[in-house]
């Protein structure tokens, strides 16, 4: 890239010097870096461009067309290239005549050499004098009578004209005459714009260099410090300094500063200082009216409210979102909230938005809840101290005073905010077709359902069924513990009623239940079963009551009162304690009748009864006894083997 820039700079050195001096004479400064970038793009997409350069306006128009074609094909053209091309094209327009265009090669050869050598010098006076002597005089004097300064100003300073909202006015009110063949009388034309002979004749007169200077209303003025910005916002940057006063004669007398738009700026400043930043938002806008007859000085101008309807694209997006996701889906709630808080919506806007997006049944629900919310808000307005002068007709956009769009556009900001809150609340209560809103008591957490999902369902149901915000918060905090599964309840129980003031209870519950149901939680539950320790480090104890003494913490078989009673009963019934070890298990001093051991001292299992009687013979049952089967050969008393004994 460095080699390419150096090649471009050496290739178009004289032409670059000429362009820079030409633009500088016109009051525009362009850096060499930007010019090199421009010629790099020109060399890439316009290979026909001559090395010696050209001053033909047709060639520069052709460059613009080819760069546009390259941009349409996907090539990236930097913005600085377009700016520099437009400035050079505008600077060359005054020098075009009906004759053939002038090329840099038409100038004397010494001009090109001197311009190339002297551009490296730091002295600005020497550069300007060389330019005036060799280039500026023969070129600029050739078409002095065809200079259109209005067009040049409009092209070079388009952004400044847009900010002021006014076209170029170089002549004051008293001098607004059509230009003739000569822009100025002969006596007022700078010396450098006269033919070269005049320069030689007037040797005693000091040369006055031409330099275009914008009128006063187009000069840069630093912005004032911000007095109505956001809290803590630093003052606006001052930017660069205003243009210095040029040491040359002005081409035109200074025009009076434009006052167009100043009334609007004063109204905007006043409204912002009063905190009314929403008065200028879409779709209702306020525009200043011209002062009428008899208006006094200092009196604020009247404003006219103008209404602009919603775009078709916005209504289409709302309709598709409601159809695809539902009116109360997170996407639709976010979209509706951004529209409501980003624009100044009047009752007519809410009605159009609901009619175009919702089905007939859903719109009927919206209208019903809207009217219900208006009645509640009117009661609050009347009970306020002092009462708020906003009635039901204004909040609904009906009646003789608020039925038209022009009347609703003049509503106060407080009424706009109340309409917004009521309509958002009514939208949240819309139910999908075929679905019913369950009670918050029936919303319970599943055994494997994550706790945040359960809380989200609970909040959604509570928001639709409970209107009061404080009551809704209390109900959600209560049901978030009562309707949770046992695992989450055990994790939340230590936090119940102990959350510090200022902290969100639901957020603390969600943190406590984080990880429940995962592998880590299952491993901890297994460790609890083995060690008898819960998550909080407390020892697991039996929570029921003993059936013997009624105490909590042990079972009946382990009841100390029952064991003490058994020992007392044995001592009173027998009159003496066991003399020796138990004859049954041989490992305890107790009577054999009270032995409950299942193993003896050697670890052998003990049966229920230690001593059993002799086994009894089987008894015959039935009317006919069963004869045993005796094989043949064994029927005699002395059977003999057929192999060992013979008859």
Swiss-Prot record:
Region annotation Disordered: where it falls in the sequence: 165-264, 598-641
Zinc finger extent (CCHC-type): 544-561, 580-597
CC terms in the record's Gene Ontology section: plasma membrane
Stretches with biased composition (Pro residues): 232-247
Subcellular location: Cell membrane
Family matches, as InterPro entries: B_retro_matrix, B_retro_matrix_sf, Gag_p24_C, Primate_lentivir_Gag_pol-like, Retrov_capsid_C, Retrov_capsid_N, Retrovr_matrix, Znf_CCHC
Predominant subcellular localization, coarse grouping: membrane
GO molecular function annotations of the record: nucleic acid binding; structural molecule activity; zinc ion binding
Membrane topology summary: Lipid-anchor
Function of the protein: The products of the Gag polyproteins of infectious retroviruses perform highly complex orchestrated tasks during the assembly, budding, maturation, and infection stages of the viral replication cycle. During viral assembly, the proteins form membrane associations and self-associations that ultimately result in budding of an immature virion from the infected cell. Gag precursors also function during viral assembly to selectively bind and package two plus strands of genomic RNA. Endogenous Gag proteins may have kept, lost or modified their original function during evolution.
Membership in a protein family: Belongs to the beta type-B retroviral Gag protein family. HERV class-II K(HML-2) gag subfamily.
Domain notes: HERV-K Gag polyprotein contains regions homologous to the matrix (MA), capsid (CA) and nucleocapsid (NC) proteins from infectious retroviruses. Evidence suggests that HERV-K(HML-2) Gag polyprotein can be cleaved into mature MA, CA and NC under certain circumstances. However, the exact boundaries as well as the size of processed Gag proteins have not been precisely determined yet.
Protein's name according to its UniProt entry: Endogenous retrovirus group K member 8 Gag polyprotein
Organism in which the protein naturally occurs: Homo sapiens (Human)
């Amino acid at each position: 890239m460095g080699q390419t820039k150096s090649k471009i700079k050496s290739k178009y050195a004289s032409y670059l010097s000429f362009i820079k001096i030409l633009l500088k004479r016109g009051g525009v400064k362009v850096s060499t870096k930007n010019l090199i970038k421009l010629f790099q793009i020109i060399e890439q997409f316009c290979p026909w461009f001559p090395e010696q350069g050209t001053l033909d306006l047709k060639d520069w128009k052709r460059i613009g067309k080819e760069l546009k074609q390259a941009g349409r094909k996907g090539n990236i053209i930097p913005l600085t290239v377009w700016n520099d091309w437009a400035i050079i094209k505008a600077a060359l327009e005054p020098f075009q005549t009906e004759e053939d265009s002038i090329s840099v090669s038409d100038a004397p050869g010494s001009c090109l050499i001197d311009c190339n050598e002297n551009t490296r010098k730091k002295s600005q006076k020497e550069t300007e004098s060389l330019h005036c002597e060799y280039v500026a005089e023969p070129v600029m004097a050739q078409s002095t009578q065809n200079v259109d300064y209005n067009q040049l100003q409009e092209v070079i300073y388009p952004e400044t004209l847009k900010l002021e909202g006014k076209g170029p006015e170089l002549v004051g009110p008293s001098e607004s005459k059509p230009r003739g063949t000569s822009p100025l009388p002969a006596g007022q034309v700078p010396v450098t714009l006269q033919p070269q002979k005049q320069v030689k004749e007037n040797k005693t007169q000091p040369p006055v260099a031409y330099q275009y200077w914008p009128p006063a209303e187009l000069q840069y003025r630093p912005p004032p410090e911000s007095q109505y910005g956001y809290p803590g916002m630093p003052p606006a940057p001052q930017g660069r300094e205003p243009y210095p006063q040029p040491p040359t004669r002005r081409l035109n007398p200074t025009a009076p500063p434009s006052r167009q738009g100043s009334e609007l700026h004063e109204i905007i400043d006043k409204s912002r200082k009063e905190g009314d930043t929403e008065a200028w938002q879409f779709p209702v806008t306020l525009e200043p009216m011209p002062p009428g007859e008899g208006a006094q000085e200092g009196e604020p101008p009247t404003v006219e409210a103008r209404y602009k309807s919603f775009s078709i694209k916005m209504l289409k997006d709302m309709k598709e979102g409601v159809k695809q996701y539902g009116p109360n889906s997170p996407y639709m709630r976010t979209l509706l909230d951004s529209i409501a808080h980003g624009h100044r919506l009047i009752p007519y806007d809410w009605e159009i938005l609901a009619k175009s997006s919702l089905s007939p049944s859903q719109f009927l629900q919206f209208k019903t809840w809207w009217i219900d919310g208006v009645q509640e808000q009117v009661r609050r307005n009347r009970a306020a101290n002092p009462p708020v002068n906003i009635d039901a007709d204004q909040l609904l956009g009906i009646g003789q005073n608020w039925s038209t769009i022009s009347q609703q556009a003049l509503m106060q900001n407080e009424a706009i905010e109340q309409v917004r809150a009521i309509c958002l609340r009514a939208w949240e209560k819309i139910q999908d077709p075929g679905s019913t809103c369950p009670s918050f008591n029936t919303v319970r957490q599943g055994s494997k359902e994550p706790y945040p999902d359960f809380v989200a369902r609970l909040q959604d149901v509570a928001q639709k069924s409970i209107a009061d915000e404080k009551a809704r918060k209390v109900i959600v905090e209560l049901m978030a513990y009562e309707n949770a599964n046992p695992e989450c309840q055990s994790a939340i129980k230590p936090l119940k009623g102990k959350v510090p003031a200022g902290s969100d209870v639901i957020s603390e519950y969600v943190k406590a239940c984080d990880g429940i149901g995962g592998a880590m939680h299952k491993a901890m539950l297994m460790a609890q079963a083995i060690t008898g320790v819960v998550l909080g480090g407390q020892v697991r104890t039996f929570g029921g009551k003993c059936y013997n003494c009624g105490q909590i913490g042990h079972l009946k078989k382990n009841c100390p009162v029952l064991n003490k009673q058994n020992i007392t009963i044995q001592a009173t019934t027998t009159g003496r304690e066991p003399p020796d070890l138990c004859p049954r298990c041989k490992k305890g001093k107790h009577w054999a009748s009270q032995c409950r051991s299942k193993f003896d001292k050697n670890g052998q299992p003990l049966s229920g009864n230690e001593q059993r009687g002799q086994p009894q013979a089987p008894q015959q049952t039935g009317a006919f006894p069963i004869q045993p089967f005796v094989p043949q050969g064994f029927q005699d008393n002395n059977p003999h083997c057929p192999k060992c004994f013979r008859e």
